[in-house]
Structures are given as structure tokens and as C-alpha cells.
């Protein structure tokens, strides 16, 4: 039997020591055994985000949003993940929800930055051939 708590502990240790890729290996195994455990999935998403495995982070965060659409922290992480992929228009709804849920001025500032990037992207001239 797999000890999910031990895998989670090791994953957190690796992440805390600056090795998010190493953490992701333990946390992915924990997630295989506990695919709806929000703590495991959040730690896995953070490990993927910190190691720039943004597609993987997005998939895990989407699962977390499906599990609890009202989790402001998950919405914030998903918005940041999408923004980091220059998908600011996709990030904006998640960041707005995070701001509404958390009422955190820093999150509201992220909304403003994402909105500005969306506006800038829409106004940018098309690339020359």
C-alpha cells in the first residue's frame, strides 16, 4: 500500500529545498493514488508551476477548479499559469474570480496587469510577413 502522506511530505521537502521537478515526481505519484485530494493536487500544481511545466500545472489546476470552483487560491494559480503562457485573455476570468473571492489588493493588481496585456495584445499590429 502506498503511503500518500509520505509522498506528500517528500514532495513538500523537495519543493521547499528548491527542487520542484523532484517534488513533482513524488506528488504525481501521490495524485495517482488520490486523484481528488485537493492538498496533493495543489502541491503538485505548485511544483509544476515552479518548474515551468505550465501545461501540466494548467491540467492539475483545471481539475482543482472542477473540484471546487469557489477556491480563490486555485483560481489565482490558474490565472497566473495562463498569464505565464502569455494567454492573458484566458487568465483574466480566473484572476477576476480570484479577486472577487479573496478581495486581495495584490490579486486585483494582477487583474489590472492581465487586462492591460489583453488590451495591448489586441492593439498590437499584426506581424509583418
Where are these regions (language model features)?
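Canonical tetratricopeptide repeat
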Residues: 9, 43, 77, 110-111
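Short coil turns that delineate tetratricopeptide repeat
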Residues: 35, 69, 102-103
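Mid-chain, well-packed structural core segment of small domains
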Residues: 60-89
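TPR/TPR-like (Sel1-like) alpha-helical repeat modules
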Residues: 83-106, 112-119
Amino acid at each position: 500500500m502506498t503511503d500518500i502522506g509520505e509522498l506528500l511530505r517528500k514532495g513538500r521537502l523537495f519543493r521547499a529545498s528548491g527542487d520542484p521537478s523532484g517534488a513533482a515526481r513524488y506528488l504525481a505519484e501521490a495524485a495517482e493514488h488520490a486523484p481528488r485530494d485537493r492538498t496533493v493536487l495543489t502541491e503538485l500544481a505548485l511544483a509544476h508551476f515552479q518548474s515551468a511545466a505550465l501545461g501540466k500545472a494548467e491540467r492539475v489546476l483545471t481539475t482543482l477548479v472542477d473540484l471546487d470552483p469557489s477556491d480563490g487560491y486555485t483560481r489565482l494559480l490558474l490565472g497566473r499559469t495562463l498569464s505565464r503562457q502569455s494567454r492573458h485573455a484566458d487568465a483574466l476570468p480566473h484572476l477576476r474570480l480570484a479577486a472577487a473571492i479573496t478581495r486581495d489588493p495584490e490579486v486585483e493588481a494582477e487583474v489590472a496587469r492581465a487586462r492591460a496585456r489583453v488590451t495591448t495584445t489586441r492593439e498590437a499590429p499584426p506581424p509583418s510577413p
